[in-house]
Amino acid sequence: MMAEPTRRRVRGAASYQRGLQAEQVAGAWLQEHGWTILMHRARTRWGEIDLVAQRGAMIVFCEVKCRPHYTTAAESLGRAQMRRLMNAAAWLCAAHPGWIYDEMRFDVLLVTAGDAVHHIADAFRLE
């Protein structure tokens, strides 16, 4: 007989599914705005970048956040996570020498209730 999943595990699975859905919504939003998705869920030893996209000579590394409200989503990216994203982006650029770009930046896409997308371009910078 299998044990019932714990409440924490059920909540975690639901959060994971919401996150996947938010990434799909964010990716579609980027494409509607002229971006080409280069990678989805790009994994590195420093962590995962949700979306890597390019438009013209600009590459963006996107973190997707899914929250019920804009303010809580905007506040959910900490300094340690920013550092991990920067390290992961540097590794991805080195691992993909075929990517041609003049500029790169870090964007945050906030997906809130009703799949509304709020785009924060150049959300943080390399220090």
UniProtKB/Swiss-Prot annotation:
It comes from the Bacteria. GO terms for molecular function: nucleic acid binding. Gene3D superfamilies: 3.40.1350.10. SUPFAM superfamilies: Restriction endonuclease-like. Signal peptide: none annotated. Belongs to the UPF0102 family. HAMAP family: UPF0102. This is UPF0102 protein GDI1964/Gdia_0189. It comes from Gluconacetobacter diazotrophicus (strain ATCC 49037 / DSM 5601 / CCUG 37298 / CIP 103539 / LMG 7603 / PAl5).
